[in-house]
Amino acid sequence: MDNVIGLEIIEVVEQAAIASARWMGKGEKDTADHVAVEAMRDRMNKIHMRGRIVIGEGERDDAPMLYIGEELGICTQPDAAQVCNPDELLEIDIAVDPCEGTNLVAYGQNGSMAVLAISEKGGLFAAPDFYMKKLAAPPAAKGKVDINKSATENLQILAQCLDRSIEELVVVVMKRERHNDLIKEIREAGARVALITDGDVSAALSCAFSGTNIHALMGIGAAPEGVISAAAMRALGGHFQGQLIYDPDIVKTGLIGESKESNLARLKEMGISDPDKVYTAEELACGETVLFAACGITPGTLMKGVRFFGGGARTQSLVISTQSKTARFVDTVHMFETPKRPKALQLH
């Protein structure tokens, strides 16, 4: 799968990022997201595959494109029998976030990117639109920190694993009221807190790379993004755990239902028998081969944002593979058209 589709998924996130970046700073987050969705969907439909969205823009009734269950790729089209050999058919599950951090794009802030993860059919956990408690940490701490431990305990373990003092650690937490106690505990333990308003996939990803000055992600964010983060962290060998949050009182507001009971019933309908289960990266992205790709929309910790010039743009992307055990940064120059040159000044 890596050799067949690796370059193409880079182009998918690049096209989404370029489309969204045109709306950077214009205050229209829905438009920035919509154009990214369109660009991502259009490019995926040109890939020789039968793909199925398992994490997308929402349920079919709520999302016109990239909805959960939508099929994409050349081999899903009416004339597929003429161009797709059943013996060589590439069937994959896809998790997407065409514009992670729509507010960041709308207000010209750092940290937004277009992301996706793919695996063979059944290789990605189809997370509901719930919240998820998350813990991400570098490869050195894999299996040593634990989401069931307190933040203080995990910081002590993390400091030991990274051979540094707690005071030298930086923990990313989303700036939400529900995290006030967590933020207080982290600070009292001696670590530093980097607050973000959106974009915890980028934060989780940064934990796995040395030199980013991000050592952990803690707190509660959206579950679908948790699966995408897990795909990247599995490929990078980093630590990731996630636990679904079904009690609305914990998050106060957001994507989950009106009552704890209705959410538990929904999870049961989805076949999730243990709602309190703590999932590892290997369980959330369980496929034999998992690929993750991202492209910066606005500048971030790992990637530069889209930079436009006359007749083109330059992007920086990242593709990670469990198959090749690589993380490749890709710098691409896109030529749109020949820029129009101004007419020579006529002097009389």
From Swiss-Prot:
Mn(2+) 2 binds at residues 97, 100, 225. Pathway: Carbohydrate biosynthesis; Calvin cycle. Substrate binds at residues 100-102, 131, 176-178, 198-200. Pfam families: FBPase_glpX. InterPro entries: FBPase_class-2/SBPase (IPR004464). Mn(2+) 1 binds at residues 33, 57. Keywords: Calvin cycle, Carbohydrate metabolism, Hydrolase, Manganese, Metal-binding. Its EC number is 3.1.3.11, 3.1.3.37. One of its GO terms (molecular function) is metal ion binding. GO terms for cellular component: cytosol. GO terms for biological process: fructose 1,6-bisphosphate metabolic process; gluconeogenesis; glycerol metabolic process; reductive pentose-phosphate cycle. It catalyses: beta-D-fructose 1,6-bisphosphate + H2O = beta-D-fructose 6-phosphate + phosphate; D-sedoheptulose 1,7-bisphosphate + H2O = D-sedoheptulose 7-phosphate + phosphate. Homotetramer. Belongs to the FBPase class 2 family. Catalyzes the hydrolysis of fructose 1,6-bisphosphate (Fru 1,6-P2) and sedoheptulose 1,7-bisphosphate (Sed 1,7-P2) to fructose 6-phosphate and sedoheptulose 7-phosphate, respectively. This is D-fructose 1,6-bisphosphatase class 2/sedoheptulose 1,7-bisphosphatase 2. It comes from Acaryochloris marina (strain MBIC 11017).
